[in-house]
């Protein structure tokens, strides 16, 4: 069976374009070396199994022979090592990308995305486990996902990671030094990972795909230098420069402050892709004019968070206006709206920017963020409030801001258990795991009659409704007359700021 799996992996690699016919013997011997085997039957017919199953068979055999450790992380390290043997060198990948880019940017990214899946860097079998549905909200269709593709470490892997020596190389999971890195118990293997150099705003960056693919062609654009996230004029310029080079992609940045930022603030990076989020579809509901910028269409977007959209043919002009708005927002305080530029020297105001092309025009969405905390809301005033934490308590980053909920894996089991508990009449409040959902379920019971046929659908729909509330909580200026008046006050200040 092992000989058939080796033949199967080689057959897969050739069909996927990772190796050519001339590479067969070389690739087989490289695999044997990685597997610590002295030989195999060269005439063995390939096992007709999906790649994930082939790798699983080879890895389990290696574990049984003591070649790989018996835990989940070690298994990932080992099967990535096997795929690394079959992954073309960076110069080959980049040459192919450049040749396709000369034909069209879209052809280049189509190929690179498929390549990143074919190398098993993007593990398609795990992505397929993610649960996804759409919630029709007042703001348009929101994407709801329960993320199951990020591997959860088993207890043995966690224990091994604690014992593993600490290393400062690579400095973080985004650094270019990850390309080809063997990994360790506390850092993922990346032998099958390739990145594409891109120049934006005159500086060296790289393009790669996220291994977890929250949406179609979910890419990461990261600085070649390990430098902290920073939202400034140069960031706007880089975002618009990128969509100038890849007009079929959007690209955005997480905010640069804790709570309202993403999970990695230490390495400057953007996220983008070939996907239309609900926020992009959302219309401008109130046009705004800025003096001296009659060439730019601006307005407040119909969205639960506070979004200003700028659209125009000249990207330099968008950068100029976005920078004016950012500078005004950084220093803006409106106590009546509970907006404070800083407290005790700690800054609170920043922006989550998203860039795209809309036809021949450039477009920037500027999402106003504030990370102030209070005793009542210790995780953030403009953050999911405590009543929603049973569904989502993590940071609301770029992806959520645009209308895609990335919900924790725990919800898969909890929603299934809740369905059974509701139908059986069990005491949810007394349940150690499900008790956090008790208030929510009691409220749902006042609006629904649950049956075996409708309970799962109701829970999914209401999870979507909670996510819409999460976004409303994260909005600085609330969607009522008071909030709208406060938004207008800020915009007036931003206009004056530019006319001084």
PLM region descriptions:
Residues 1-221, 225-228, 304, 318-322, ...:
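Active-site microenvironments that recognize anionic phosphate/pyrophosphate groups
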Residues 192-194, 224-251:
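Helical scaffold of the NTase/Pol beta-like nucleotidyltransferase catalytic core
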Residues 234, 243-266, 272-326, 330-333:
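Catalytic or ion-translocation cores adjacent to nucleophile or general acid/base/metal-coordination motifs
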């Amino acid at each position: 069976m092992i000989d058939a799996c080796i033949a199967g992996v080689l057959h897969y690699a050739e069909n996927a374009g990772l190796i050519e016919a001339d590479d067969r013997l070389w690739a087989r011997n490289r695999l044997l070396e990685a597997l610590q085997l002295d030989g195999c039957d060269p005439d063995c017919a390939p096992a007709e199994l999906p790649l994930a199953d082939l790798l699983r068979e080879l890895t389990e055999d290696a574990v049984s022979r003591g070649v790989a450790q018996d835990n989940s992380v070690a298994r990932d390290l080992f099967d990535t090592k096997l795929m690394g043997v079959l992954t073309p060198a960076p110069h080959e990948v980049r040459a192919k990308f450049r040749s396709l880019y000369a034909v069209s940017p879209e052809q280049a990214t189509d190929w690179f995305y498929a390549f990143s899946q074919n190398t098993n860097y993007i593990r398609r079998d795990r992505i397929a486990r993610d649960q996804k549905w759409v919630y029709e909200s007042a703001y348009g269709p929101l994407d709801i996902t329960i993320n199951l593709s990020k591997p959860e470490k088993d207890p043995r892997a966690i224990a091994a990671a604690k014992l593993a020596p600490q290393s400062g190389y690579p400095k973080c999971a985004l650094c270019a030094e990850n390309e080809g890195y063997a990994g360790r118990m506390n850092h993922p293997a990346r032998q099958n990972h390739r990145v594409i150099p891109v120049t934006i705003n005159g500086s060296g960056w790289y393009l790669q795909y996220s291994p977890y693919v929250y949406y179609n062609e979910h890419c990461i654009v990261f600085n070649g230098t390990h430098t902290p996230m920073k939202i400034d004029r140069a960031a706007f310029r880089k975002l618009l420069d990128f969509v100038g080079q890849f007009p079929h992609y959007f690209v955005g940045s997480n905010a640069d402050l804790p709570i309202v930022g993403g999970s990695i603030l230490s390495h400057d990076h953007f996220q983008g892709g070939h996907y239309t989020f609900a926020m992009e579809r959302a219309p401008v509901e109130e046009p705004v004019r800025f003096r001296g910028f009659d060439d730019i269409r601006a307005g407040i977007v119909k969205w639960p968070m506070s979004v200003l959209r700028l659209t125009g043919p000249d990207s330099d002009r968008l950068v100029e206006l976005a920078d004016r708005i950012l500078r005004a927002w950084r220093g803006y305080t409106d106590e009546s709206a509970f907006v404070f530029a800083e407290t005790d020297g700690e800054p609170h105001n920043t922006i989550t920017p998203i860039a795209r092309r809309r036809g021949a025009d450039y477009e920037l969405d500027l999402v106003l963020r504030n990370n102030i905390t209070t005793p009542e809301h210790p995780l953030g005033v403009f953050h999911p409030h405590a009543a929603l934490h049973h569904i989502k308590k993590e940071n609301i980053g770029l992806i959520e801001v645009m209308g895609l909920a990335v919900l924790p894996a725990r919800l898969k089991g909890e929603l299934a258990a809740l369905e059974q508990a509701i139908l059986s009449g069990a005491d949810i409040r007394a349940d150690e795991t499900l008790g956090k959902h008790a208030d929510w379920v009691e409220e749902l019971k006042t609006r629904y009659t649950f049956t075996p046929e409708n309970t799962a659908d109701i829970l999914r729909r209401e999870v979507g409704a909670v996510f819409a509330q999460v976004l409303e909580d994260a909005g600085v200026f609330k969607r009522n007359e008071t909030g709208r008046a406060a938004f207008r006050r800020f915009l007036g200040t931003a206009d004056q700021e530019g006319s001084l």
